[in-house]
């Protein structure tokens, strides 16, 4: 019998909705829920092992979010038509689900737990990541897994001053703010945001608006769990052996507090002292007493945390002696590596990032595939955290989820100030290698990334700095900490990262380890972060105030031209043969867009000019009124076909071959001859040419100048392929524009013509052997004897006639 699912719907401000359904699919999972937003559908499941995992002191939670291409009605690309490893988007969304739910499991719960969210259907309007977070919350709520939820998640946009809940893709592109807010009915537990220099008040207003919508989600999930949810498992409360902790404090409390004083000891020395104290305590315990050793480890860590929290909340003192709003010492250097396109070292306290920028072309952009199709990404920021940065030994493997998450945050912070692609067509890759770490390494990556991009000459709208804020809260008493170090991050209640310019916020990330925080605490934290951000920006401006005006000599230069869209095929050639030939001949990179925009990139200026000229020759179009040096490709009874541009033929009708009437085209022309022709008309792909018009113009010109030896005729620029040299394109390039061809001034001086024969010259007399000389020149025939290269024309040496003294006689001189 078909099961009847339980369905509940949330109605949001603005008319959008989110529906939850349970009891129909994946019923053997301990908890499952279907979440719908528009036509986007996500299935979320939750399962936990019955028995706790032995020998661990952490909660073994795994979260996986997957976007299958079938959700968008697509096949996976490539040879293997099956989804493979998770994409970056899937990993980041998995983290967005993990981070808010992890603190809400009861302390002491050690059963392996797995949450899986699968995108089953995806429309082109609604991002399913919101459904994934809400689905995970609903699946846990209706399961028997102990969970102190539910949570709700909404994305908030800001368009023309109005907050919008769960904006569509189109709305997000127009939004000043893109903020994911996750919380319980009581408070906010996670924030993930990108923004275009939003103010602190705009951010807080969006968060408060989002929390109002979250309360609606939590109410619906709670009602659903109450109606169809399973009975929760019982978890034995963690008992605190207070006498044991007090005894440990009395015995080593003072020594441990001294060892944790990083104002007195550097981080490495402090950690060594802390480890030494613990080792001495272990020596007092029998080696085979595992229970006692385990208990010592647990309470030793509790004592460390308690000492830290008491120092901050009661003594108003940080471990390194700084004031709550004080930033560690900063030193900065740019242009540190000779061959990179841009580089910077940003050091803040014991955290150091070496950040490099590499500029590339369209071919270097990241190609991404998802259910919505394929896309390109021109800006990438990759964050690396080698083990030596914290003095440890470990295998070097691929980037983990933490590294991907930190890189994405820094990337989002800098994306807001990048120039638009039409003004800056480069692909950009920023790599942050953390060389030292004691907290806030992702924020050091943002600062170093901004410096590195400016060192590379990327015209950023403004420099960006990032700062990490912390919170220690005991009851109503709390302290907000600026520029938190590693211990403050580990033992504190909040990790609040804020990045931005002098004008506003570009990225935000907040994780809360407690039940939630109030809007007032958030306002104070944002204001304190703003002051810290401005301080860091001042330090950065002391080193480099604006992007460099000159690119590195090793960076590629972009040259752009616009070609007709119907010429794209000619440029690419069959199987890419033509464009590959240009690349192989010049070493440049070429990117052709569907609009006809061609980007040529090379660090060698001469190679780029050569490639541009080759492209211009291949894609040039015939212009009415212009004269071209063409090659006869085929003869017919009614005329000749002349290639005036590569791949472009025009018809030279028999009536336009000469000024006099001819009976047979072969009397004047042969295949392979080069002739000067003028374009009379262009009708689609049909081009009408005239040689007669060129001859008339030349004769008139010579007559005006007094006939005879009127001096050498001016040369006409031409390309290697016979097309006019130089190209005209959007923006221009140093090769210059196409020279205008003056009427009556064709080029008679072509030395590199195929077959080593001269250009066909205009006639003053006839081509017949019996024709005598006329004014301005003899009537040499279509002779094959001499080259006829005298200034002003020169005789061709005919079959029976003779060339005039200064005339333009001579037909096909083929000497």
Curated annotation (Swiss-Prot):
CDD domains: KH-I_PNPase (cd02393), RNase_PH_PNPase_1 (cd11363), RNase_PH_PNPase_2 (cd11364), S1_PNPase (cd04472). GO terms for molecular function: 3'-5'-RNA exonuclease activity; magnesium ion binding; polyribonucleotide nucleotidyltransferase activity; RNA binding. Its EC number is 2.7.7.8. Residues 700-815 are annotated as: Disordered. Residues 723-734, 775-815 have a biased composition (Gly residues). GO terms for biological process: mRNA catabolic process; RNA processing. Residues 556-615 form the KH domain. PROSITE patterns: KH_TYPE_1, S1. It is an enzyme of class 2 (transferase). It comes from the Bacteria. SUPFAM superfamilies: Eukaryotic type KH-domain (KH-domain type I), Nucleic acid-binding proteins, Polynucleotide phosphorylase/guanosine pentaphosphate synthase (PNPase/GPSI), domain 3, Ribonuclease PH domain 2-like, Ribosomal protein S5 domain 2-like. It catalyses: RNA(n+1) + phosphate = RNA(n) + a ribonucleoside 5'-diphosphate. Residues 735-745 have a biased composition (Acidic residues). Gene3D superfamilies: GHMP Kinase, N-terminal domain, K Homology domain, type 1, Nucleic acid-binding proteins. Residues 625-692 form the S1 motif domain. Keywords: Cytoplasm, Magnesium, Metal-binding, Nucleotidyltransferase, RNA-binding, Transferase. Its main location: cytoplasm. Transmembrane segments: none annotated. InterPro entries: ExoRNase_PH_dom1, ExoRNase_PH_dom2, ExoRNase_PH_dom2_sf, KH_dom, KH_dom_type_1, KH_dom_type_1_sf, NA-bd_OB-fold, PNPase. Belongs to the polyribonucleotide nucleotidyltransferase family. Involved in mRNA degradation. Catalyzes the phosphorolysis of single-stranded polyribonucleotides processively in the 3'- to 5'-direction. This is Polyribonucleotide nucleotidyltransferase. The lineage of its organism: Bacteria, Pseudomonadati, Acidobacteriota, Terriglobia, Terriglobales. The gene is pnp.
């Amino acid at each position: 019998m078909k099961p009847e699912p339980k369905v509940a719907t949330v109605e949001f401000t603005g008319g959008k909705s989110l529906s939850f359904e349970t009891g129909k699919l994946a019923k053997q999972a301990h908890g499952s829920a279907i979440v719908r937003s528009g036509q986007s559908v996500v299935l979320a499941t939750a399962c936990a092992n019955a028995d706790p995992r032995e020998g661990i002191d952490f909660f073994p939670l795994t979260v996986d979010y997957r976007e299958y291409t079938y959700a968008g009605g697509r096949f996976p690309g490539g040879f293997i038509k099956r989804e493979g490893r998770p994409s970056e988007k899937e990993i980041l969304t998995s983290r967005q689900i993990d981070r808010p739910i992890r603190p809400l499991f009861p302390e002491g719960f050690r059963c392996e737990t797995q949450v899986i969210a699968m995108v089953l259907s995806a429309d082109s309007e609604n991002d399913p990541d919101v459904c994934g977070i809400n689905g995970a919350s609903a699946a846990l709520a209706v399961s028997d897994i102990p969970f102190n939820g539910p949570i709700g998640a909404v994305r908030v946009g800001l368009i023309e001053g109005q907050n919008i809940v769960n904006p569509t893709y189109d709305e997000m592109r127009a939004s000043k703010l893109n903020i994911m807010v996750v919380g319980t009915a009581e408070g906010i537990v996670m924030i993930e945001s990108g923004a275009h220099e939003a103010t602190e008040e705009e951010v807080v207003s969006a968060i408060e608006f989002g929390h109002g919508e979250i309360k609606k989600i939590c109410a619906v999930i709670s009602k659903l769990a109450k109606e169809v949810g399973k009975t929760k498992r019982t978890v034995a409360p963690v008992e605190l052996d207070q006498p044991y902790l007090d005894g440990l404090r009395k015995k080593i409390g003072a020594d441990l507090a001294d060892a944790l004083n990083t104002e007195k000891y550097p981080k490495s020395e402090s950690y060594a002292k802390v480890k030494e104290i613990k080792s001495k305590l272990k020596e007092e315990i029998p080696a085979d007493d595992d229970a006692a050793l385990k208990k010592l480890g647990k309470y030793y860590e509790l004592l460390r945390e308690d000492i830290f929290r008491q120092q901050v909340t009661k003594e108003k003192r940080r471990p390194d002696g700084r004031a709550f709003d004080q930033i560690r010492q900063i030193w900065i250097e740019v242009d540190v590596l000779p061959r990179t396109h841009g580089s910077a070292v940003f050091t803040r306290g014991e955290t150091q990032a070496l950040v490099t920028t590499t500029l590339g072309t369209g071919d270097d952009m990241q190609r991404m595939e998802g259910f919505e199709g394929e896309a390109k990404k021109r800006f990438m920021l990759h964050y690396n955290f080698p083990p030596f940065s914290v003095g440890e030994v470990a295998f070097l493997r691929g980037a983990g989820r933490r590294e991907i998450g930190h890189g994405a945050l820094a990337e989002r912070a800098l994306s807001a100030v990048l120039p638009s692609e039409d003004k800056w067509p480069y692909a950009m890759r920023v790599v942050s290698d953390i060389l030292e770490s004691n907290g806030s390494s992702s924020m050091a990556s943002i600062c170093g990334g901004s410096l590195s991009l400016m060192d590379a000459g990327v015209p950023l709208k403004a420099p960006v700095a990032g700062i990490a804020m912390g919170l220690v809260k005991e009851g109503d008493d709390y302290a907000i900490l600026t520029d938190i170090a590693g211990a403050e991050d580990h033992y504190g209640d909040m990790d609040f990262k804020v990045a931005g310019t002098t004008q506003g916020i570009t990225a935000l990330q907040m994780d809360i380890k407690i039940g939630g925080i109030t809007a007032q605490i958030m306002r104070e934290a944002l204001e304190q972060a703003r002051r810290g951000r401005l301080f860091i920006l001042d330090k950065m401006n002391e080193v480099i105030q604006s992007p460099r005006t000159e690119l590195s000599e090793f960076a590629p230069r972009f040259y752009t031209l616009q070609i007709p869209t119907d010429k794209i095929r000619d440029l690419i050639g069959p199987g890419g043969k033509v464009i590959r030939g240009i690349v192989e001949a010049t070493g440049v990179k070429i990117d052709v867009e569907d609009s006809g925009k061609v980007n040529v990139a090379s660090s060698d200026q001469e190679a780029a000019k050569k490639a541009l000229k080759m492209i211009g020759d291949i894609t040039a179009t015939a212009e009415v009124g212009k004269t071209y040096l063409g090659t006869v490709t085929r003869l017919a009874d009614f005329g000749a076909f002349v290639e005036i541009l590569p791949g472009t033929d025009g018809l030279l009708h028999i009536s336009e071959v000469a000024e006099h009437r001819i009976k047979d085209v072969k009397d004047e022309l042969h295949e392979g001859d080069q002739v000067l022709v003028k374009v009379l008309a262009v009708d689609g792909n049909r081009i009408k040419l005239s040689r007669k018009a060129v001859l008339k113009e030349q004769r008139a010109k010579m007559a005006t100048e007094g006939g005879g030896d009127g001096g050498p005729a001016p040369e006409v620029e031409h390309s290697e392929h016979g097309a006019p040299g130089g190209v005209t394109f959007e923006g221009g390039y140093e090769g210059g524009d196409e020279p205008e061809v003056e009427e009556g001034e064709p080029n008679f001086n072509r030395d590199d013509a195929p077959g080593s024969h001269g250009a066909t010259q205009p006639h003053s007399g006839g081509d017949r052997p019996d024709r005598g000389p006329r004014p301005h020149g003899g009537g040499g025939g279509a002779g094959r004897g001499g080259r006829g290269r005298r200034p002003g024309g020169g005789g061709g040496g005919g079959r029976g006639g003779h060339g005039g003294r200064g005339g333009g006689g001579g037909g096909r001189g083929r000497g």
